[in-house]
């Protein structure tokens, strides 16, 4: 069985390959990436919610590839910012900004707040879609706090700022294996993998 991991983020695809099962029952699963489909064009994330974006990406990728596709949308929700950056997490500092610019904007937005006022969560919505347009959704959440600066060398995006609830480390200070055991993405994709037939 072949399933397309519909993400252009190579680090995310690597993470997903570590999380997802290699077999379902007696079926071996081969996970393909967008690199295996050079003509496939992913849609713009025009949804107003994480759910809408995950569905949009998975359904379109499955339709174009002709095989089942897994996609997700992840957002960082910060309580002191009324849930921002949320669905716009990748574009928080602007449409064409890089992760460092997003991180700096987040730190600036929280300037003056104590650590206890910086509660946040990562939320991932995963979608499994068929070429016919049918889909299933699953959600995963990881709670924590936004620190005062960058810590750690691993991960990507907001990982160097996000202190995991119950730990003294940021996601970027964890090894990939440690992160994959607790992450919001793991929780969502473990749930969605139970729906693969």
Curated annotation (Swiss-Prot):
Biological function: Pyrophosphatase that catalyzes the hydrolysis of nucleoside triphosphates to their monophosphate derivatives, with a high preference for the non-canonical purine nucleotides XTP (xanthosine triphosphate), dITP (deoxyinosine triphosphate) and ITP. Seems to function as a house-cleaning enzyme that removes non-canonical purine nucleotides from the nucleotide pool, thus preventing their incorporation into DNA/RNA and avoiding chromosomal lesions.
Binding site for Mg(2+): 44, 73
Keyword annotations of the record: Hydrolase, Magnesium, Metal-binding, Nucleotide metabolism, Nucleotide-binding
Protein name in the entry: dITP/XTP pyrophosphatase
E.C. designation(s): 3.6.1.66
UniProt GO MF annotations: dITP diphosphatase activity; ITP diphosphatase activity; metal ion binding; nucleotide binding; ribonucleoside triphosphate phosphatase activity; XTP diphosphatase activity
Reaction catalysis annotation: XTP + H2O = XMP + diphosphate + H(+); dITP + H2O = dIMP + diphosphate + H(+); ITP + H2O = IMP + diphosphate + H(+)
Cofactor binding description: Binds 1 Mg(2+) ion per subunit.
InterPro entries assigned: dITP/XTP_pyrophosphatase, ITPase-like_fam, RdgB/HAM1
Taxonomic source organism: Elusimicrobium minutum (strain Pei191)
GO cellular component: cytosol
Family as reported in the entry's similarity comment: Belongs to the HAM1 NTPase family.
